[in-house]
Amino acid sequence: MVLDAVGNPQTVLLLGGTSEIGLAICERYLHNSAARIVLACLPDDPRREDAAAAMKQAGARSVELIDFDALDTDSHPKMIEAAFSGGDVDVAIVAFGLLGDAEELWQNQRKAVQIAEINYTAAVSVGVLLAEKMRAQGFGQIIAMSSAAGERVRRANFVYGSTKAGLDGFYLGLSEALREYGVRVLVIRPGQVRTRMSAHLKEAPLTVDKEYVANLAVTASAKGKELVWAPAAFRYVMMVLRHIPRSIFRKLPI
């Protein structure tokens, strides 16, 4: 990667430019060194200017806003070109997505398709484009925000969980495909994180703050890791849940 003298990235791209977790990761990188931050978000997102201001206040060398509509996959090549037009991108964070109402999603075809297109199809679209660019660079780090919900899909939120299962599988495979080209991929599987998106939910065990996820993302990337859980204990929880028979699993209060 194009790093400074002590190994910090010079350019960070955030796909989902107003994502609280994504911005926390950017800010964590800025704690180490000033960097160019590129925020890709909806042109009418009311939080985009505040996000840019927060990055400047956190110490960004410069902040660029580019338009990104996850649903408009035909526009993604042009968006990625714009993101790389100012030079190589060292770190790209894929942190956009919807949660939705779990019970409504499986009973509403339009909303089910929408969340699948945003959480999975769009994530694949930008992943392929990022891989192409970083492969040409010969370096780069992709950080993909997955979810513990995708590791074993539960009845409680199976539409959302299934989209994250797809994203998770794609980026783990992309990690293998890019290994020989000097490009790294980190998949993060958080449980519940305290953000706007989860504010209406009852807090679950092992819930963490976005700053915890951000610190994990930066430190795990620096160590060359490919898959981490947030918190780490979720790895062992999911290890057990993955092997519980369906007849028993469906009776668990999760």
From Swiss-Prot:
What do the Gene Ontology cellular component annotations say? Answer: periplasmic space; plasma membrane
- Which keywords annotate this record? Cell wall biogenesis/degradation, NAD, Oxidoreductase, Periplasm
**Enzyme nomenclature, EC number:** 1.1.1.333
Which pathway does the database say it acts in? Cell wall biogenesis; cell wall polysaccharide biosynthesis
Binding positions (NAD(+)):
D67, K164
Primary location class? periplasm
Q: Which GO terms describe its molecular function?
A: oxidoreductase activity
**What InterPro entries does its record include?**
NAD(P)-bd_dom_sf, Sc_DH/Rdtase_CS, SDR_fam
- Compartmental location: Periplasm
List the GO biological process terms. arabinan biosynthetic process; capsule polysaccharide biosynthetic process; cell wall organization; cell wall polysaccharide biosynthetic process
Top enzyme category: oxidoreductase
The reaction(s) catalysed by this protein are:
trans,octa-cis-decaprenylphospho-beta-D-arabinofuranose + NAD(+) = trans,octa-cis-decaprenylphospho-beta-D-erythro-pentofuranosid-2-ulose + NADH + H(+)
The superkingdom listed in its UniProt entry is Bacteria
Q: How does it assemble?
A: Interacts with DprE1 to form an epimerase complex.
Question: What does the protein in this record do?
Answer: Component of the DprE1-DprE2 complex that catalyzes the 2-step epimerization of decaprenyl-phospho-ribose (DPR) to decaprenyl-phospho-arabinose (DPA), a key precursor that serves as the arabinose donor required for the synthesis of cell-wall arabinans. DprE1 catalyzes the first step of epimerization, namely FAD-dependent oxidation of the C2' hydroxyl of DPR to yield the keto intermediate decaprenyl-phospho-2'-keto-D-arabinose (DPX).
User: Hey, which family's this protein in?
Assistant: Belongs to the short-chain dehydrogenases/reductases (SDR) family.
Name of the protein described by the UniProt record: Decaprenylphosphoryl-2-keto-beta-D-erythro-pentose reductase
Q: Which organism is it from?
A: Mycobacterium tuberculosis (strain ATCC 25618 / H37Rv)
